[in-house]
A protein has these predicted regions:
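Short aromatic loop motif centered on NTY/YTY
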Residues: 99-130, 139-215
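Beta-propeller blade repeat segments, especially FG-GAP/WD-type strand-to-loop junctions
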Residues: 70-92, 128-139, 187-192
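Glycine-aliphatic tripeptides that mark coil-to-beta-strand junctions in extracellular
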Residues: 53-57, 111-112
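SH3-family beta-barrel domains
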Residues: 195-228, 241, 274-288
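Repeat-based blade/solenoid architectures
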Residues: 31-44, 90-103, 148-159
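SH3/SH3-like beta-barrel superfamily modules
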Residues: 238-287
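Calcium-binding loop positions in Ca2+-binding modules
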Residues: 46, 50-54
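Sec-dependent N-terminal signal peptides of Gram-positive bacterial secreted proteins and lipoproteins
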Residues: 2-24
Length: 288
């Protein structure tokens, strides 16, 4: 009888251990839309956000000046609080915002990223990008900042995830470009050596806003010089004022940005404008 009791207890122990192991391990869906609430609301307990393939307990809340769940008299925040397994990480913003949205994206290799978009007035973005937990630093870090890629060449920039394929993320940027006005450009980022990196300097132009229409056909507002390749000084041709062109592609590297276009059947690259006072095309929508 004692042997039978001992065998039953051993079997029960093994079942408990097995059950705990199964519940502790998890595999995230590719995308999970998250709710941002107070520090006591929307606590998630079914997903891995630290990248160790184990379930984490986490939630995302907003706050003001280091105080969670607080906002100013106008309803604005300047902090995002990410609480993971009883530890809280604060994202501070120099710009006040009135709300935020978040999603959890996971690559094929199991690496999770939090997508956070804190929205402020006039469609600007105070905090906007992909964030991940850095095990060596033991804190949340920025993986991709959507607001900085086109610094110096756009008045504002936003971005969203349009596709995940394996370990590659396609990001669609919406920007108010000094050269093209309102336009949409996509870049791919792939996981390599522990980081999300752009796969190319060449971005795909999706469209340009031309009034109520989307297009790639524009008209030169002034004489423009086209080069044979981005970053070179070899001239390809000169575009006359008033001439029609077709915008093809963009190139962004370091502090430089070039735009590929077709003019009279020939292809060339122009330097992107760095200020909206030096407009290159006459029929695009510019908003400051």
């Amino acid at each position: 009888m004692k042997k039978l009791m001992g065998s039953c207890l051993l079997l029960l122990s093994l079942m408990l251990i097995s059950t705990f192991s199964v519940s502790a391990a998890t595999k995230n869906p590719t995308k999970v839309n998250l709710r941002i609430g107070s520090s006591r609301q929307n606590v998630y307990k079914s997903y891995d956000v630290t990248g160790d393939s184990k379930v984490d307990q986490f939630n995302i809340a907003l706050g003001l000046n280091g105080k969670i769940d607080k906002k100013d008299s106008n309803g604005y925040y300047n902090n995002i609080f990410i609480s993971i397994n009883d530890k809280t990480y604060i994202m501070k913003s120099a710009t006040y915002f009135y709300g935020a949205k978040a999603s959890l994206y996971t690559l094929a290799n199991g690496k999770p990223y939090l997508y956070i978009d804190a929205i402020t007035d006039n469609d600007y973005h105070a905090v906007f990008g992909l964030f991940n937990y850095d095990k060596s630093k033991k804190k949340m870090v920025t993986a991709v900042n959507f607001t900085t890629l086109f610094n110096g060449y756009a008045a504002r920039c936003s971005g969203d995830i349009v596709k995940i394929s394996g370990n590659t993320i396609k990001v669609r940027y919406g920007l108010m470009c000094y050269s093209l006005g309102g336009c949409t450009i996509t870049y791919n980022y792939t996981y390599k050596n522990g980081k999300l990196l752009r796969t190319s300097y060449y971005g795909t132009l999706v469209n340009i806003s031309k009034g109520q229409h989307l297009t790639k056909l524009l008209t030169a507002k002034r004489t423009l010089t086209a080069y044979k390749a981005p970053g070179t000084t070899q001239k390809a041709f000169t575009i006359k004022k008033g001439a029609p062109v077709k915008i093809m592609q963009v190139w962004r590297k370091g502090n430089s940005m070039y735009i590929k276009l077709m003019y009279g059947g020939s292809y060339g690259w122009i330097k992107a404008a760095t200020a909206n006072t030096s407009q290159q095309f006459s029929d695009v929508m510019y908003v400051g």
